[in-house]
Amino acid sequence: MSWWLAGLIAGVAAYFADYFMWGKVFTKGMDLFVTPPPAGQPVNMGPMLGKSAVLSLIFGLLLAWLYRRFMLALWVSGGGPLAGMEFATVLWLPTIALSTLGSGIWYDRARPLLNATFWSWLVRMNVAGLVVGLLVK
């Protein structure tokens, strides 16, 4: 399968993983970090979900493109789901993991949000990596 189609499918999978993590797993205590709508207006989730979907598709495309370029340099040879997860985790560790851990040192009030970001991005990247590893040959 071509990398761009695999990237779009991985973006959709990442979107659903992200929706699950932020909608079902990380719900307690996150109200402190939300900007409330003006008084008397409901929360309009449509535009936010749309932006998240577009960003997830872009993320999937970038992940698939980078995976295709670097798949021969991975420890897991021959591609496959484990290679995709390895690639995703290798990208996650020096970027998102260290960033959220480092920010948690200074911004102690935001630590619950940073911990949620830490774990949700690990799940999101591994789901997308699994899909890309399965589909890109």
Language model features with spans:
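Juxtamembrane/disordered regions of integral membrane proteins
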Residues: 1-137
